[in-house]
Structure formats: structure tokens, C-alpha cells
Amino acid sequence: MATQVFSNCGTYFGQYVISTDMSAVALSTAADALEKTAMGATVRTFKKGLYDTKANVEGYYSAGTGLISPILDETYFAIKDVPITIIPLTTQYVENCGAYSFPATIATWNSFGGVGEMMKFRATAETTATPAIPGYVAYYGTKTAVGTTYSTALQITGGAPAGKNIYCALHVFSHSAGGDTLDVTLQNDALVGFGDPTDCIAMTQSVAVGYEWKTDVGAAAHAEDFWRVKMVLSAEPISITFAVFFGIY
């Protein structure tokens, strides 16, 4: 995957939407090529090593609770496996829009600026666990009513055949107090009506703001074509704002 630079994109990091504080994101995925050439071979052969996936983020420094600088420098610096989800084409959510996501660690952070200039920042979120997983943001919004709802079904021809992994990221941006809960499950089925859905990934029940990255590694075949997210909310009063990403790779 070549480096891709996005200058007008939506970005979720952990429990925060950081899009409005950034001016650009450069996303890249590479992998180590480890030589395994045998004695007497006439050609060199290689084996894939660790991934090197990075999102280089830059923008304008903003200090204060819930703002970009303390989020990246204090809250998440050197914290492992915080999901970052990048929507390349728009800062606004569109249902089932294409996105990339991976479990990241903020490995570098610096702020800089000359006298009389706006202070800027640069940060690098990276991982060796996965590539930048291509997928979809199945839902982003606020739920205020108890009950079960579903995202709009998305058709992915061939689904997730055996040997493919399924990935899911949950970003919970706000969560009302009072015992309300959110359960998110990724489902698929052979038919768009979901008469007999299969649960593929069940996220940990959410009771507060936070995030989770979950993987069905070496998944059994989920080759049905239609995919959706099931969302179950309980207890009132309730108001939960969250986003759900899933991808197959």
C-alpha cells in the first residue's frame, strides 16, 4: 500500500473525534521482507515479517480538556492498541462509508511554531499488528431510546471466506450516566432481510465512554454476502454517541 495523504477526512481516535483539529493525515502500510533463501537456490526468496502501519497526523495545537493536544500527548501517548479510524473522503459520516482502521500507539509527538505564528503539532500513530484495515463505518450517531436497532445492510460479495480475518472497532464518544448500556454485535446473513443472522463479533458491553478493537482471527468462513451491526440499548434516561467500524482482510 502506497502512502496516502488525506487533507479533508473524518478521524476517530479512541473515544474522541479529532477531525476538526487536524490539517492532514498520511496513511501508509508496509511489511518487513525477511530473506529465507536456501543453500544452492538460484533466486532469492522472502517471507513476510512484521507490518509497519503508520498514520502521520498534523494540525494546530489546541490545549485544554478534550482537545487535540492533551488527547494525543497526555491521554494516549504510548498507550497500546487505541483504534484509529480514518474516513478518507469526507469529514462527515455517511452510512457504510469506506474507511481504514487499525489499533494504534502514539509513538511520536512534537509541537512547534515560531514567534507570532500558530503553534502546530505532529504525531505518529503506528502498529506492527495489522495493516491499515480497509472497511466501513457502519454507524455513527447518537441513540436516545431503549431497544434494538440495526445499521443498514451492506452487501459484500463473498463475505469473509475461511482464512480471512474480521475486524471491528467501537468508539464511544459520550455516554450518559445512570446505568444505561450498549451492546454492539457484527452480524451477517445470506439474505438482505436477515432472517437467520450469524453473530460474527460481539463487542464488550459499553457502560461509559471508551473504545475497543476486536478481531476474529483465522475466522471460520462467514461467506454470506450481507452484513450489519446490531445495537442494543438498555436503561433510561439514555444518550450514547458512538461509531462502529468493521473490515475484512
List the model feature ranges, each with a label.
Residues 1-63, 95-126, 131-161:
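Solvent-exposed edge beta-strands and adjacent loop segments
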Residues 134-137, 232-249:
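Edge beta-strands of jelly-roll/beta-sandwich modules across compartments, strongly enriched
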